[in-house]
Each structure stands twice: as C-alpha cells, then as structure tokens.
Amino acid sequence: MEYTVSYLLVLFLIGAIGSILSGMVGIGGSVIKYPMLLYIPPLLGFVAFTAQEVAAISAVQVFFSTLAALVVFKKGGYVSFRLVGYMGTAIVIGSFIGGYGSKFLADETINFVYAILASIAAILMFFPKPKGSEEVSAEQLAFNRLYAVVLSFIVGVASGIVGAAGAFIIVPIMLVILKVPTRIAIGSSVAITFISSIGATVGKIMGGHMLLVPSIVMVIASLLAAPIGAKLSQKINTKVLEYILLVLIVATVIKIWYEMLT
C-alpha cells in the first residue's frame, strides 16, 4: 500500500481527535477511531483498510493512548489503584473466558449480548449521581468490592465474546453503581483499559494484521494528543464530561443495534 503525505495527515488527524476524546472521558478510543478509520479514508478517496487491519491499528493505538493519558491522570491523583486492581483483574479474566467461549456462540447471540450490555450502560448514564461524591480523593475512595469484581467480570466476558473494549461500559458502572467520582472513574478506567489492551495488542501483532506505517502514525498522534485530552479532563466541569461520555455511549449503542438489525 502506498502512503501519500495527505493520506498520512488524515490518519494523524483521526488518531489525534480520537485520542483527545478518549483521554477526556476515559475510554480506550477504539469506539471512536474504529469507525473513523474504516469509513473516512475511502470517503476522501483513499484506499480503504479491511476490518482486520482497522482492528489491529486500533489495538496498538489504544495501548499507547491509554499509556500516555494514564501518566497525566496518575500525576493528578485521579487513579485509584485499588479499584484498578479489583476491576482490572476481573475484566482481564472475563475477557479471556469470553474470547474462548465465543467460538461456541452464534454471531447473532454475540451481537445481542453486547447490544444489551451497551444499552444498560447508556441507561445508567441517565441515573442521577449521589451528591458530594466528587469531593472524595483516590486514596479515600471506598467502594463495594464484590460489585466491582462481579460487574467488571461480566463486562470482561461480554467484551471478550465480541472482541471489543468494554471501557465505555465500565465508566457508567463506576459512576452510578460504585459511586466513584467522575475524574477518578475516568482516570481509573484509562488504567484498566491500558491493562486490558496489552493482550489485544500482542494478539494482533502475532496475528500478522499489523500495518507498520499507519500504526506508527496513529501511535505518534496518540502520544501527542491523549495527554491533551487527559489535561482537559481535569479542567472541564464534570457534568460536561458526563454529557460527552453519554453522547459517545448512545452513539455506540445506536450503531450496535443498527448493525445487528440490518
């Protein structure tokens, strides 16, 4: 595949825009960048990527964008490592089980499981958050460990079944059910997504679907843009962050149901 300067610029902008948004609201970015990579290049007259190539590029990009954003959130004190330990471990174990078990399920069942879970995440975002929860620090954070482990395990299984990240589902669970402050939920979600992206990145590289040049461009964009999104996240009003997250989740849910029903 031949890469012109304009093509590489388009890829860089896709990576930068997606990384800023994902850094702001604590999702890995594949939810945003996957459709952008799949549809924008051919719309502009460039050669289209295959779904496998897009998934591979997204996996590598998510790894580096979450790593870059995590550094910023950690400095700001918005990462609860206890929360990350419980939920990160459960979601990784769940994703392995879901990934293996998916071969026993029909495609329709796989899509339905994820559509239902994503819809629940969207509904959760409409629930009011408890007052005063934003004042708790990451060190003082108390949460129901059983709920954290069980719910993140379920998300991990569903994510593994579908082969997609579950960060956009984890954040609403943290906000509404575990009552985690918005900025800590976002920072901790970035850490969890980073952990869960390691396996996906290694798998895609070993699978031979990696395109070196686009991946490098997207990684550079991520390393530059994700910290910007993370810094913006610490300055923007938490309500605005929740609205941005809500829009992204609802758009994802609509896309999932549309693809399943058409």
Placement of each model-derived feature along the sequence:
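Juxtamembrane transmembrane-helix boundary motif
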Residues: 1-23, 32-45, 52, 68-158, ...
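Interfacial helix-start motif at the membrane-water boundary
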Residues: 51-58
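Transmembrane helix boundary and interhelical junction motifs in multipass membrane proteins
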Residues: 25-34, 163-173
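Hydrophobic, membrane-facing alpha-helical anchors
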Residues: 6, 10-14, 59-69, 165-171, ...
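Aromatic-anchored, glycine/proline-accented short structural segments
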Residues: 169-191
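Short hydrophobic/aromatic, small-residue-rich stretches within specific transmembrane helices
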Residues: 58-62, 189-193, 214-219
